[in-house]
């Protein structure tokens, strides 16, 4: 069976891993890095992904970051006259990770396990699945990030019974899950989180502080200057990372703006204490879901065996201190917070292919599911933290006499009134026979699959008429839209490959021109002038083709010049060897002569000893 890769599709960084020899291994990208920034840039119809896209974000307004925060919404971003959905941008990142995996494994990759925040709702999960399809991947399973982290952590510790808390603070989302590990079973007991809290918010408090300080000093609002804002974002991210290791850092941004007197510079020292003061509210926001998860699980903090930190933002000292204070446990440092989720996704891929045996994963639904009933009340059918996959049915009736149809309004959330919860979808069960209210028996069944994706059906028990829906929110994509995006993504991948080959061809041609000049110079006066003229002529023909940008002509002229240069290079080596041989011969003769010249005539006198 072909390999199933594990992908952590993160808000700020993404990572891909695979099972090899019974161990999950992170796959480096072409630059040799183990994580790839979740950044996509467009420049003259060319798409750039990762570090190269992030580096030019300051000067390129067509750079898209943190798109994960918009998954499952109807958000669109316009780039070069075309609208892109979050699914399409995520698919570009996934294509890049897929290509890294294929280069590493030396085979085509078509299947993946992709992780999502535990607190992602149905629409966000469906959007992630669609992104995988657009990227040319069969998404075998969607699993929750804290659960994946627990899988990677617990793979070697299946014999130990443990209660663990996974605290996952990523770039854009926060999750906390409580799990029990025993005999290869990873059972999620409870989960809680905040999908609008992460490292980006910690960056933002630094940015706001810098903007306020600069405005106080110069009366200029940098938040209105797009390019200055991007520089501030880069500086804030760097300062945040620095302050995990040192107690203060210098932020220096020369020529950030201009005033009446000339250019203005931003120079500021940020201490760890000031950063902790600025971000105290954010750290506190992570503790409420932590307490809720513990309460839902019915555990006291003292019952926990391990606290595992996941996500780059957990490197912030104030975050580590807060979770230590809350649980009374020193956080476990034996996993890499940037990689552990992808490693866990790879383990789940191994479970699905049969490469990993004896592991059973029992996850939960993060939010309650139900329908709207009379008076706008939210009636729950499946409570949050129910183990999935699961199915639950309940019988409802009509609210009016001779009602011909019922509207089924499907919701997800924890509030008592429907209006305060998230609508997942609506559908109708029609052609009900006339009857007094309260008489028809309508059975509503909710199914949640292992990916956390919801199916709902309604059945009139009197007539056996049934209506079903796979939840597709207003932001969801139809099969036709996904198919169109798949084709566009494939076409773009081909175009990107073609552009890469064109760039490589031009680089090779330029290199050959330089090499020709060097060889001709080295052979000056040593070979027939006609041969040198032939090489020069072929070189000039290639230069003309490069200037015209005629790719086929460049290829033909390059091949012709390559042959001539190879012949000249052979002659260059032959001459060098001949010269070396002559030099050795001359040296040998010289040594012999030297020995002859150095012969000293000495007088010999025999001395006889008297006996």
Swiss-Prot record:
<keyword id="KW-0143">Chaperone</keyword>
<dbReference type="InterPro" id="IPR043129">
    <property type="entry name" value="ATPase_NBD"/>
</dbReference>
<comment type="similarity">
    <text>Belongs to the heat shock protein 70 family.</text>
</comment>
<dbReference type="GO" id="GO:0051082">
    <property type="term" value="F:unfolded protein binding"/>
</dbReference>
<feature type="compositionally biased region" description="Low complexity">
    <location>
        <begin position="577"/>
        <end position="592"/>
    </location>
</feature>
<dbReference type="GO" id="GO:0005524">
    <property type="term" value="F:ATP binding"/>
</dbReference>
<feature type="modified residue" description="Phosphothreonine; by autocatalysis">
    <location>
        <position position="173"/>
    </location>
</feature>
<dbReference type="InterPro" id="IPR029047">
    <property type="entry name" value="HSP70_peptide-bd_sf"/>
</dbReference>
<protein>
    <recommendedName>
        <fullName>Chaperone protein DnaK</fullName>
    </recommendedName>
</protein>
<dbReference type="Pfam" id="PF00012">
    <property type="entry name" value="HSP70"/>
</dbReference>
<dbReference type="InterPro" id="IPR012725">
    <property type="entry name" value="Chaperone_DnaK"/>
</dbReference>
<dbReference type="InterPro" id="IPR029048">
    <property type="entry name" value="HSP70_C_sf"/>
</dbReference>
<dbReference type="InterPro" id="IPR018181">
    <property type="entry name" value="Heat_shock_70_CS"/>
</dbReference>
<keyword id="KW-0067">ATP-binding</keyword>
<feature type="region of interest" description="Disordered">
    <location>
        <begin position="577"/>
        <end position="598"/>
    </location>
</feature>
<dbReference type="GO" id="GO:0140662">
    <property type="term" value="F:ATP-dependent protein folding chaperone"/>
</dbReference>
<dbReference type="InterPro" id="IPR013126">
    <property type="entry name" value="Hsp_70_fam"/>
</dbReference>
<keyword id="KW-0547">Nucleotide-binding</keyword>
<keyword id="KW-0346">Stress response</keyword>
<comment type="function">
    <text>Acts as a chaperone.</text>
</comment>
<keyword id="KW-0597">Phosphoprotein</keyword>
């Amino acid at each position: 069976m072909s390999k199933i890769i594990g992908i952590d599709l993160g808000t700020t960084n993404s990572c891909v891993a695979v099972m090899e020899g019974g161990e999950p291994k992170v796959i480096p990208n072409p630059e040799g890095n183990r994580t790839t920034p979740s950044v996509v840039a467009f420049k003259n119809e060319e798409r750039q992904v990762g570090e190269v896209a992030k580096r030019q974000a300051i000067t390129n307004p067509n750079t898209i970051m943190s798109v994960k925060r918009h998954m499952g919404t109807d958000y669109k971003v316009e780039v070069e006259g075309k609208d892109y959905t979050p699914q399409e941008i995520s698919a570009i990142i996934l294509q890049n990770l897929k290509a890294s995996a294929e280069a590493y494994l030396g085979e085509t990759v078509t299947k993946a396990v992709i992780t999502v925040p535990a607190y992602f709702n149905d629409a966000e999960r469906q959007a992630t699945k669609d992104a995988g399809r657009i990227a040319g991947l069969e998404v075998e399973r969607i699993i929750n990030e804290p659960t994946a982290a627990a899988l990677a952590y617990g793979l070697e510790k299946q014999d130990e019974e443990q209660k663990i808390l996974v605290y996952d603070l990523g770039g854009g989302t926060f999750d906390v899950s409580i799990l029990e590990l025993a005999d290869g079973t990873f059972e999620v007991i409870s989960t809680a989180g905040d999908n609008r809290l992460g490292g980006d918010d910690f960056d933002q408090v630094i940015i706001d502080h810098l903007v306020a300080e600069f405005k106080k000093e110069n009366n200029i609002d940098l938040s209105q200057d797009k390019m200055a804002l991007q520089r501030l974002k880069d500086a804030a991210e760097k300062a945040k990372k620095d302050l995990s290791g040192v107690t203060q850092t210098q932020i220096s941004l020369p020529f950030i703006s201009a005033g009446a007197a000339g250019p203005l510079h931003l120079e500021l020292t940020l201490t760890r204490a000031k950063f902790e003061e600025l971000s105290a509210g954010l750290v506190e926001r992570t503790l409420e879901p932590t307490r809720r998860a513990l309460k839902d699980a019915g555990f006291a903090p003292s019952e926990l065996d391990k606290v595992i930190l996941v996500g780059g933002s957990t490197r912030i000292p104030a975050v580590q201190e807060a979770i230590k204070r809350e649980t009374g446990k020193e956080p476990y440092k034996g996993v890499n917070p940037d990689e552990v989720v992808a490693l866990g996704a790879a383990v789940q891929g191994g479970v699905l292919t049969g490469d990993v045996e004896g592991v059973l994963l029992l996850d939960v639904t993060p939010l309650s599911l139900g329908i709207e009933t009379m008076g706008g009340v939210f009636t729950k059918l499946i409570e949050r933290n129910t183990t999935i996959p699961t199915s639950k049915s309940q019988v409802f009736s009509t609210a009016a006499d001779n009602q011909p149809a019922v509207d089924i309004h499907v919701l997800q959330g924890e509030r008592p009134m429907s209006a305060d919860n998230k609508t997942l979808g609506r559908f109708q069960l029609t052609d009900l026979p006339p009857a007094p209210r309260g008489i028809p028996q309508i059975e509503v069944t909710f199914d949640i699959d292992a990916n956390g994706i919801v199916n709902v059906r309604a059945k009139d028990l009197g007539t056996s008429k049934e209506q079903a829906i796979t939840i597709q929110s207003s932001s969801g994509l139809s099969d036709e839209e996904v198919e169109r995006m798949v084709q566009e993504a494939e076409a773009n991948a081909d175009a990107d490959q073609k552009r890469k080959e064109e760039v490589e061809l031009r680089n090779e041609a330029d290199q050959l021109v330089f090499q020709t000049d060097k060889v001709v110079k080295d052979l000056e006066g040593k070979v027939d002038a006609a041969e040198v003229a032939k090489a020069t002529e072929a070189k000039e023909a290639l230069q003309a083709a490069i200037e015209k940008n005629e790719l086929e002509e460049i290829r033909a002229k390059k091949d012709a010049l390559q042959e001539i240069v190879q012949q000249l290079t052979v002659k260059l080596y032959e001459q060098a060897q001949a010269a070396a041989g002559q030099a050795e011969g001359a040296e040998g003769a010289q040594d012999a002569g030297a020995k002859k010249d150095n012969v000293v005539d000495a007088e010999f006198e025999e001395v006889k000893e008297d006996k």
